[in-house]
């Protein structure tokens, strides 16, 4: 009987410990014993912003946290807190940070998949690289279309057209273009504590954490001049794709300044299904230039990027 009581007490103690851990730390995994109040919801969101945001060491952030708690103290539901949290996340993470509602996430998942394009003009291969949002099958289709276009066509130079590419999943874009990129570090994420995480390309695979995609042929294409086209609608992952080409000798950037969302967001799920998209790292290119949501400036500023790129490629052919 005594042994049974000890076992029972032990189980009770373990359960109490487990429940205590969930109570104290469950928010990190979006696990709750009971639905959080709107005020708890706000505190959890602010704590995540505090831990991850790039600008949370500032006096402005300290004041913003206090003000946000005060402004939401009488909120009756989660929806009433969102406008205040939207303001707060911009202070914590900068302009690239935002809150995405569950319905917006659902709409985004239904966004029509846009396939990249490949065409030959003269002796130049022109690749149009749209933003990517889609499933793993579409990611594979996207990446392998670009890869096969690079390996199956005859051309003297390549135009990588990233104009209008606002981002999405980085992996299929970079993997599709990987025959043009040297293996090794493409760029590096740098957080507010100066910790670095390189994004690397090796043997047709990338460690960016996006779609699980592989290409059929990772043979490198060398020496071909590459023109990268950007404009003010090239943003986020579109810009990071462009930065993968920075510092490569046979590359020239043409067009206009990019959108200036050169940073990385981390996703945190909230209780109601909304997500915090918190900017947690800036980007360092292979030449050690650090982009803190700065735009990429092209080597050649032009309103006629495509025709200028074709002329530049012609000038590089010997």
Curated annotation (Swiss-Prot):
The UniProt record lists the keyword Transmembrane: yes
Record membrane topology: Single-pass membrane protein
Keywords recorded for this protein, A-Z: Antibiotic resistance, Cell membrane, Membrane, Transmembrane, Transmembrane helix
Any one GO CC term of the record: plasma membrane
Signal peptide: none
Location(s) in or outside the cell: Cell membrane
Superkingdom, natural source: Bacteria
Subcellular location, principal: membrane
Gene3D superfamilies referenced in this protein's UniProt entry, alphabetically: 2-enoyl-CoA Hydratase, Chain A, domain 1
TM region(s), chain numbering: 7-28
SMART domains with a match to the protein in the record: TSPc
SUPFAM superfamilies associated with the record: ClpP/crotonase
GO biological processes: proteolysis; response to antibiotic
InterPro entries reported in the protein's UniProt record: ClpP/crotonase-like_dom_sf, Tail-specific_protease
Molecular function, one GO term: serine-type peptidase activity
Name of the protein described by the UniProt record: Nisin-resistance protein
Organism: Lactococcus lactis subsp. lactis (Streptococcus lactis)
Gene giving rise to this polypeptide: nsr
């Amino acid at each position: 009987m005594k042994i049974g009581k000890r076992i029972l007490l032990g189980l009770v103690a373990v359960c109490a410990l487990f429940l205590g851990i969930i109570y104290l730390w469950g928010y990190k995994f979006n696990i709750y014993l009971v639905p959080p109040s709107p005020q708890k919801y706000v505190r959890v969101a602010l704590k995540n912003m505090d831990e991850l945001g790039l600008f949370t060491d500032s006096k402005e952030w300290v004041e913003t946290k206090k003000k946000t708690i005060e402004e939401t103290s009488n909120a009756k539901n989660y929806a009433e807190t969102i406008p205040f949290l939207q303001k707060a996340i911009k202070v914590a993470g900068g302009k690239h940070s935002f809150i995405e509602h569950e319905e917006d996430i659902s709409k985004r998942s239904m966004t029509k998949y846009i396939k990249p394009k490949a065409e030959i003009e003269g002796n130049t291969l022109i690749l149009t690289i749209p933003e990517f949002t889609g499933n793993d099958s579409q990611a594979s289709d996207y990446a392998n279309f670009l890869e096969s276009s690079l390996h199956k066509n005859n051309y003297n130079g390549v135009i990588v057209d990233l104009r209008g590419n606002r981002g999405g999943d980085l992996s299929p874009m970079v993997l599709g273009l990987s025959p043009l990129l040297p293996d090794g570090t493409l760029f590096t994420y740098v957080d507010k504590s100066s910790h670095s995480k390189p994004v690397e390309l090796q043997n047709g695979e990338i460690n960016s954490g996006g779609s699980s995609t592989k290409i059929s042929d990772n043979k490198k294409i060398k020496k071909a001049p590459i023109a990268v086209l950007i404009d003010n609608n090239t943003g986020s992952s579109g810009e990071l794709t462009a930065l993968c080409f920075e510092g490569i000798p046979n590359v020239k950037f043409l067009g206009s300044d990019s959108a200036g969302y050169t940073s990385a967001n981390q996703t945190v799920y909230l209780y109601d299904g909304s997500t915090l998209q918190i900017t947690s790292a800036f980007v360092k290119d292979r030449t050690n230039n650090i982009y803190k949501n700065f735009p990429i400036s092209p080597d050649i500023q032009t309103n006629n990027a495509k025709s200028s790129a074709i002329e530049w490629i012609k000038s590089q052919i010997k």
